[in-house]
């Protein structure tokens, strides 16, 4: 009997009538989905409200039979409408729309469950359970495991005690619950539900097949999730699935005690496909467990059961990986060939298998594999080649052997042919990039030969169109650089010329300069440097690079020329690669390495001074410590160049260098005593070198030079107190004394060159110096000698200097008798020229008498021999003129002086006898009358010790 044939009960309570009316209207709206404008969300909400009301009514009083039948009729209509809606493409939508439809679907079994099981409806409980089962599957497909499980759990009690013919529904429910548990991550519950279903599945081969599929599905999920529960193993699940397949395929699998519903004989399902699928997944599980023998056993069983149809491609892949894992590369090679011959294998799968094989076999097998792929992959051959080459490159051990294998691989004509055509533009670019990157890695490792080989092969994948012009030029330039590094200079020049043809730019011009420099062709390098400067994309940075390259090649001229040209660009208000001061420093440093470059160094040092004045110290040299170092470098360089030029007697250069040093030292930290001390020294040295240049060139200083020298000395004089060291150190004090002397000496010299007489000022200058602690006898001797020379000698200054020299020297703890003797000689000469007391002979005699007093009592060798001989000879010879003039008294005085000096000086002993004889003869000739002045004019005792009185004959 059908539900529609049941007699309705018309005496319904009024409250139920309203609910039935609302339900009927809602069902009608669901049925008329094509013409109704009611939104699915509203339908779902209405059904939820009606279900809530019915549940409330059922809890207060049980439904009558007629009411239950009405609800069943409406619930069945609702289910049929839901099925129609699901089959309609008009309601297809996203996950949210499908969730609403699933909620409407679930309302049907919920209504039937509320209505209860009416009498006369066959298998009513099984139908409700089936509706819940299908509703749960809908939720499961949407990923709502909680709602799906709720549906399954409501359905299970309805059929758990069902008759034999309804146990199929219970099996389906258990399988669905197992799937839901697996999706929720509860693999243990899923396995328990599958185990609980074994008695149900034993009733028919189809049931066994369904359970086997359930085990396989849960096994796949477990394998994919790598479930950590040791009680649940994917291999066990796959084995269970295989056992069920075997039982289902057996003719005796159906129990005679449980005949099928309707009495029909069950058909044995085709389980070979399912078995092979189970074997594939079991092999995969064994492969993950690295049980390579287990993998191969599964594959053998699968292949043994295979008919004429093609095997699944994954079988070949797993077999190859298993052979690789067991170390049998020959069998792995065979499996790879078999896979490529399999028409079902996709190109992507073949390439992936080839990558795995090459990762184990190494680059030596790449050529064979790539040729096979070229024949196998018709549409994606270029992409396959790219993947294989990438695998070889990324395979590790990036040595030269691997690079050579790559080069041979990509240069094969069959491989290159795969990239022909406009459709492979992307693959060509990728292959070029792979080879380029590999080549640059070897370049960074300084394997230039290998790098050049790879870069050259990469050009096979660069088209000759306009878009690839820049890339081709880059390749040519890198090839040129590699050959430069290998010293294949002619070959490098060929490549850079090709690059220049493709894309003329400054990079090519610079490489030509580099090659010419390394070949030692400076003239060609000069020409190419001019070409480089004229390039449209000229960048001053390349002049800096040229200078560095020229210095490394010891090409002094090119380095200087490049820096000189670079220096000329700093006034153009353009960004420059390095500060102007750094260019000047490097240029001067280069010039200072070569002899005879003082003029050039001076020119650029002047430029530095001028730019410092124009821009300011910090703007030109920089601020902080760096700027201070730059400034000190120029100051020290000027000082050192001044010393070098002076040593080489290039006084014109030396004077200006010292003048520049003073300017640099005074330009920063003027309040610093150390800097002001250096300024003072530099100014004094500048004037000193000017005077030396005048003497060397024998050309008087100009009035402007004299004026400048006076100004510099005046400026230095104000700074002289700063020269003395704060802490007394012998060497520093000596240097300070020397500069004080030089200042005095130079000032004396310039005073003598002024237009007006300056004898008093000169004398006062020497007196001031003589009273200072810096004064030494040697300084006074030099001043005295200088004062006695020249066109306008200052005799007063000379006499004062020489006398002060003698006095100072005698007062020292260790008198320097060489200085004293020189001063005595000069003083004697002055006395011979001018008698300060009005008597020429008396002034000279006083000097000799002073000399006699000094030498008496000296140790042998203390007084210089040659000076002593000069004193004796000069004193003796002074008697010659008086003798001729018959001035016996004067002659006797000088002869006795010479004889007395000879007795006390070394080296005169041989002559004393002859001198004594001569003197005695003179006495006889001059007469016997006593000499009135003999006692008065005889030499007095030495101030340094006692002496015997000369014997008067």
Curated annotation (Swiss-Prot):
Major place of residence: nucleus
Biased composition (Polar residues): 943-953
Cellular component aspect of the GO annotation: chromosome; nucleus
Top-rank lineage group of the source organism: Eukaryota
Identification of the protein by name: TPR repeat-containing protein ZIP4
Oligomeric and partner information: Interacts with HEI10 and SHOC1.
Localization, UniProt: Nucleus; Chromosome
Annotated PANTHER family: SPORULATION-SPECIFIC PROTEIN 22
Function: Required for crossover formation, complete synapsis of homologous chromosomes and bivalent formation during meiosis. Is specific to recombination events resulting in interference-sensitive crossovers (class I meiotic crossover) and works cooperatively with MER3 to promote crossovers.
Phenotype caused by lack of the gene: Complete loss of fertility due to defect in meiosis.
Gene that this sequence comes from: ZIP4
One Pfam family of this chain: SPO22
One BP term from GO: homologous chromosome pairing at meiosis
Residue spans of the TPR repeats: 129-162, 432-465, 473-506
Region of interest (Disordered), ranges: 248-269, 925-953
SUPFAM superfamilies in alphabetical order: TPR-like
Alphabetical UniProt keywords: Chromosome, DNA recombination, Meiosis, Nucleus, Repeat, TPR repeat
């Amino acid at each position: 009997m059908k539900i529609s044939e049941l007699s309705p009960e018309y005496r319904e309570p009024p409250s139920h009538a309203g609910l039935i009316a609302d339900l009927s209207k809602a069902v009608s709206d669901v049925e008329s989905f094509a013409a109704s404008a009611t939104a699915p969300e509203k339908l779902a909400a209405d059904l939820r409200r009606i279900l809530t009301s019915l549940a409330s009514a059922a809890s207060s009083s049980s439904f009558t039979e007629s009411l239950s039948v009405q609800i069943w009729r409406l619930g069945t209509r609702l289910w049929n409408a839901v099925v129609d809606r699901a089959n309609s493409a008009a309601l297809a939508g996203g996950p949210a729309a499908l969730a609403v439809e699933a909620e409407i679907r679930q309302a049907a079994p919920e209504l039937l469950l509320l209505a209860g099981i009416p009498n006369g409806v066959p298998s009513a409980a099984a139908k409700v359970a089936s509706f819940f089962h299908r509703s749960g599957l809908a939720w499961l497909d949407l990923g709502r495991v909680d709602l799906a499980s709720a549906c399954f759990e409501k359905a299970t009690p309805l059929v758990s005690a069902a008759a034999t013919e309804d146990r199929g529904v219970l099996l389906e429910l258990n399988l669905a619950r197992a799937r839901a548990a697996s999706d929720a991550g509860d693999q243990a519950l899923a396995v328990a539900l599958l185990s609980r279903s074994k008695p149900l599945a034993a009733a028919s081969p189809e049931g066994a097949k369904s359970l086997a599929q359930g085990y396989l599905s849960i096994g796949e999920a477990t394998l994919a999730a790598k479930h950590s529960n040791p009680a649940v193993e994917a291999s066990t699940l796959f084995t269970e699935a295989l056992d069920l397949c075997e039982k289902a395929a057996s003719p005796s699998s159906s129990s005679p005690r449980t005949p099928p519903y309707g009495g029909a004989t069950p058909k044995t399902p085709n389980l070979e496909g399912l078995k092979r699928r189970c074997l594939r997944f079991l092999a995969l599980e064994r492969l993950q467990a690295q049980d390579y023998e287990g993998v191969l056993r599964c594959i053998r069983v699968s292949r043994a059961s295979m008919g004429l149809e093609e095997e699944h491609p994954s079988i070949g892949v797993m077999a190859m990986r298993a052979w690789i894992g067991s170390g049998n590369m020959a069998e792995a090679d065979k499996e790879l060939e078999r896979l490529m011959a399999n028409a079902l294998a996709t190109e992507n799968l073949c390439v992936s298998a080839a990558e795995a094989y090459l990762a184990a076999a190494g680059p030596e097998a790449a050529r064979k594999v790539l040729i096979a792929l070229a024949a196998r992959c018709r549409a994606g051959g270029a992409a396959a080649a790219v993947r294989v080459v990438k695998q070889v490159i990324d395979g590790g051990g990036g040595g030269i052997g691997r690079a050579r294998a790559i080069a041979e691989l990509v240069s094969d004509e069959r491989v290159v042919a795969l990239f022909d055509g406009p459709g492979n533009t992307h693959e060509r670019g990728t292959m070029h990039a792979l080879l380029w990157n590999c080549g640059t890695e070897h370049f960074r490792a300084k394997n230039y030969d290998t790098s050049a080989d790879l870069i050259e092969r990469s050009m096979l994948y660069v088209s000759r169109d306009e878009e690839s012009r820049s890339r081709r030029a880059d390749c040519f330039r890198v090839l040129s650089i590699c050959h430069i590094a290998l010293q294949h200079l002619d070959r490098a020049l060929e490549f850079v010329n090709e690059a220049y043809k493709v894309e003329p730019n400054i990079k090519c011009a610079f490489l030509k300069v580099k090659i010419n420099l390394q070949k030692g062709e400076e003239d060609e390098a000069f020409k190419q440097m001019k070409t480089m400067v004229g390039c449209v994309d000229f960048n001053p940075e390349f002049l800096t690079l040229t200078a560095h390259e020229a210095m490394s090649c010891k090409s002094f001229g090119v380095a200087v020329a490049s820096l000189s040209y670079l220096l000329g660009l700093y006034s153009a208000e353009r960004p420059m690669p390095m500060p102007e001061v750094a260019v000047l420093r490097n240029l001067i440093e280069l010039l200072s390495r070569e002899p005879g470059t003082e003029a050039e160094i001076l020119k650029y040092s002047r430029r530095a001074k001028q730019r410092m004045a124009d821009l300011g110290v910090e703007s030109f040299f920089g601020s902080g410590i760096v700027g201070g170092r730059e400034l000190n470098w120029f100051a020290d360089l000027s000082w050192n160049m001044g010393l070098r030029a002076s040593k080489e007697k290039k006084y014109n250069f030396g004077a200006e260098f010292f003048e520049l040093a003073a300017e640099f030292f005074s330009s920063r930290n003027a309040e610093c005593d150390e800097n002001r001390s250096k300024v003072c020294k530099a100014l004094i040295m500048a004037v000193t070198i000017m005077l030396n240049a005048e003497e060397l060139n024998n050309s008087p200083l100009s009035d402007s030079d004299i004026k400048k020298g006076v100004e510099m000395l005046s400026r230095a004089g104000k700074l002289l107190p700063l020269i003395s060291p704060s802490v007394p150190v012998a060497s520093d004090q000596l240097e300070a004394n020397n500069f004080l002397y030089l200042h005095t000496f130079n000032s004396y010299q310039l005073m003598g060159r002024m237009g007006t007489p300056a004898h008093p000022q000169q004398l006062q200058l020497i007196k001031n110096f003589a009273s200072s602690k810096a004064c030494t006898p040697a300084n006074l001797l030099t001043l005295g000698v200088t004062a006695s020379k020249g066109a306008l000698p200052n005799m007063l200054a000379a006499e004062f200097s020489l006398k002060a020299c003698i006095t100072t020297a005698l007062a020292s703890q260790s008198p320097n008798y060489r200085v004293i003797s020189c001063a005595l000689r000069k003083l004697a000469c002055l006395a011979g020229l001018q008698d300060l007391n009005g008597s020429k002979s008396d002034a000279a005699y006083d000097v000799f008498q002073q000399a006699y007093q000094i030498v008496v009592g000296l140790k042998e060798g203390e007084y210089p021999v040659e000076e002593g001989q000069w004193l004796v000879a000069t004193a003796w010879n002074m008697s010659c003129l008086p003798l001729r003039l018959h001035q016996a008294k004067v002659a006797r005085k000088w002869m006795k002086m010479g004889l007395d000096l000879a007795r006390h000086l070394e080296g005169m002993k041989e002559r004393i006898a002859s001198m004594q004889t001569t003197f005695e003869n003179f006495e006889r000739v001059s007469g016997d009358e006593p000499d009135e002045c003999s006692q008065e004019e005889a030499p007095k005792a030495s101030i340094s010790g006692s002496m015997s009185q000369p014997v008067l004959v």
